[in-house]
Amino acid sequence: KANSNSFGDSKVRIFDVEAGLNYERLLGTKHDVSAVLTFNRNQQTTDTQQMANYHQGLFGRASYAFDSRYLAEFSFGYQGTEQLPKEKRYGFFPAVSLGWILSEEPFIKRTIGNKLLSFIKFYGSYGLTGTDDGIPYFYYLPTLAKTGSSRYHFGVNGTNVGGWGEGSVFNPHVTWEESLKLNVGTDIRLWKDRISLGFNYFKEKTSQILTTRYTVSTLSGYGFGGPLENIGKS
């Protein structure tokens, strides 16, 4: 009995560029401000896919803290991908967060003190994120596919020949899948950080999920599903 094994390998080439600016400053004695702005470009190429896959984006964050007690932050991502049609290629995804470090309040220090309550912070954030994961490569463009040798019939005798025909279904309106995320909670440390507690509530609502709209004929076993569309929710 003869056995045969086959082995193969593939190469992935990644080219990544990132550049950023950072700013920090203390205004007076109680106003702490900072900002970060970053540009990123990513390119991936594999042996089986000659055309590179590009992503690029601009990411920013601005933070403010007053007297180490009251915190506020705004962040955003302006992301681009060639997986989407030109008019929808870039998406803007902002987020905001607030925080309150209660243990830094003078009345807490006077009444409870740092020995019992080392640290307590309340926080909350709300933001929008987007992803192009799961979108087939160049799905927004029509394609041609090579047919078999008996696809077309010509002449009186019906000679069978191959050729090219319409490829897989496509969707010129495909866009980002988006998620709204809410997160609120508190962090507590007691007795000089000997005990740590944390409470967190998280909620996510996703829309424009890429899925297929099945027709009655498809469900009954005839026909085929339509193109992937951004119609799903969770």
For each feature predicted by the language model, list its residue ranges.
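Extracellular/periplasmic, surface-exposed regions of secreted and cell-surface proteins
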Residues: 1-234
